[in-house]
Structure formats: structure tokens, C-alpha cells
């Protein structure tokens, strides 16, 4: 989840902000794994896909909480995948980049108050494919990872960002 706490340097982050972001992005995934993994292990089958972000692969100024929480989620998934593999349970991560969602509308408005269209144009220009991804494009990757077509895919991270991460 991209959380609405605004951008802040590490010196301005409060404990309340820290807890808010980590409770959702890290604890939420942790508890999901904690309570579903035993069932999947017992069934000797299952697939879990958690959504991190391109932000979990990089660092961004004034985005310490969001970026670091997504890094943490990716680490949790790596360990969970190793622990679940002997039980035929798969754990993977998707890392969306700039996706055409309400979250991006909020970011555009914050980055360029009163000029959201200019912000959107700048984001489009930054992406090598010159466009935002669509939610369905992320959903298609998740659908594949959850399907029987991906039974040997685990501990993997899939970046869906129009090659932005390579820039």
C-alpha cells in the first residue's frame, strides 16, 4: 500500500508514521503468512503473492519509510519461500512501478499541486515504454504466479514497470 503520510526526510519521521507504514506494509504481510502458511503446508500445496513495489528495489529521497518497508517485505518473502518450498508452497513478489491507479493520481497531485497533468507527463517520460502500466497488467502476472502454470516458480520477484527500474 502506498500510504498517505507525505514525503519526509528521516529526521522528520515520527514513530507514529513509522508504525503506520510498517504495520500495513510489513506486519500485514507477516500476519497473512503466519496464518495461511500452516494451512498450505498441511495441504502440501499453495501459492502466495505479495505486492511490494519498484520502491523495494531502489532508494528514493524522502521515501525512507515506504522504500524500506517494501525492502522488508521482499526479505520476508524470500525467507518464507525457502521455509515453504519443502511443502510445495510457493511465495513470490510482484513489484509494480508507475501504474494507472488512484495512488498515482494522489502522488501526481502531491508532486505538482495544481499541475497533476504535468506530473503525469513527467512520469510517462521517465518510463522507457512512455506510458503508465495498467492494473490489469499487474493482475495478469499475479494470476500467472497463482496458477498451475507456475508450479516451479518460487522465491521470485517480478518487476512490472515498463523497464523503469533499468533506468
Give a label for each model feature.
Residues 85, 90, 153-155:
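Short, small/polar-rich loop/turn modules that mediate ligand/substrate recognition or access, typified
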Residues 11-30, 49, 73, 129:
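Catalytic Tyr-X3-Lys loop
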Residues 38, 82-83, 151:
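Alpha-helical segment proximal to the catalytic Tyr-Lys
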Residues 33, 69, 77:
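Active-site helix of classical SDR
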Residues 6-10, 14-19, 119, 123:
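Substrate-binding pocket helix/loop in short-chain dehydrogenase/reductase
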Residues 53:
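Residue(s) in the substrate-gating loop at a strand-loop-helix junction
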Residues 8, 13, 59-67, 79, ...:
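Active-site loop-to-helix junction immediately N-terminal to the catalytic Tyr of the SDR YXXXK motif
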Residues 58, 143, 154-167:
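Short C-terminal tail/terminal secondary-structure segment
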Amino acid at each position: 500500500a502506498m500510504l498517505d503520510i507525505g514525503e519526509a526526510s528521516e529526521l522528520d519521521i515520527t514513530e507514529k508514521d513509522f508504525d503506520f507504514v510498517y504495520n500495513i506494509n510489513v506486519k500485514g504481510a507477516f500476519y497473512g503468512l503466519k496464518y495461511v502458511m500452516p494451512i498450505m503446508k498441511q495441504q502440501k500445496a499453495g501459492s502466495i503473492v505479495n505486492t511490494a513495489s519498484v520502491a523495494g528495489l531502489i532508494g528514493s529521497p524522502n521515501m525512507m519509510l515506504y522504500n524500506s518497508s517494501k525492502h522488508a517485505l521482499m526479505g520476508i518473502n524470500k525467507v518464507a519461500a525457502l521455509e515453504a518450498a519443502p511443502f510445495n508452497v510457493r511465495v513470490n513478489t510482484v513489484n509494480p512501478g508507475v501504474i494507472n491507479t488512484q495512488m498515482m493520481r494522489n502522488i501526481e497531485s502531491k508532486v505538482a499541486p495544481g499541475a497533476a497533468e504535468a506530473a503525469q507527463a513527467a512520469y510517462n517520460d521517465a518510463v522507457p515504454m512512455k506510458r503508465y502500466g495498467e492494473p490489469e497488467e499487474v493482475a495478469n502476472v499475479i494470476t500467472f504466479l497463482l496458477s498451475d502454470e507456475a508450479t516451479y516458480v518460487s522465491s521470485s520477484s517480478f518487476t512490472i514497470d515498463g523497464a523503469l527500474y533499468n533506468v
